[in-house]
Amino acid sequence: MEQVSAAKLAVLEDILESAIQEERKLVVIARFLPEIRAICRLSEKKGLRYSIITGAVKNRDEQVAQFQNDRDVPVFVGQIATAGLGITLTAASTMVFYSMDYSMSNYEQTKARIHRVGQRMPCTYIHLVAKGTVDVKVLRALRNKADLAKTLVDDYRSGLNPFAS
């Protein structure tokens, strides 16, 4: 039996219902395959068709095209390590991070899937983070990495070389 947070699924269900009522498409990103399977089951339970990209999916271009072009496919489910590069998901302007990994590169690249040329709506990012879980640590680590990167760039732009010995 795979363990997946029932609380997160309940929140995601509310987000899905809201998006569908407003006729908006939604991208849901997760790290682990059991979570992805649970998200797919939730979509099926709601009668929603979805596109999916994980490491095992071979027809990625078809999955993306289906999500981008088919009004009857309102949900895209992606694994953060494999759905974060080289695809355009501008049919949606909302992305839900069901779970994340510690890679700042994966995080930024994944966010950029909906925030690219062709996007006509403001982008919204929702992070499902439960107090007292590893999710808090991952989000904190990503924020610290972003702060460090900003500091290094700001120092470099102001004439300080953070890499000089």
Language model region names:
Residues 87-100, 123-127:
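A short beta-strand element within the Helicase C-terminal
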Residues 102-165:
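A conserved SF2-helicase RecA2
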Residues 39-41, 87-91, 108-109, 139-140:
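Short amphipathic alpha-helical segments
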Residues 54-58, 99-104:
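Short, acidic/turn-prone active-site loops that include or flank metal/cofactor-
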Residues 1-76, 80-87, 153-165:
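Conserved Helicase C-terminal RecA-like lobe
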Residues 76, 95-96, 114:
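Short, well-ordered beta-strand core segments
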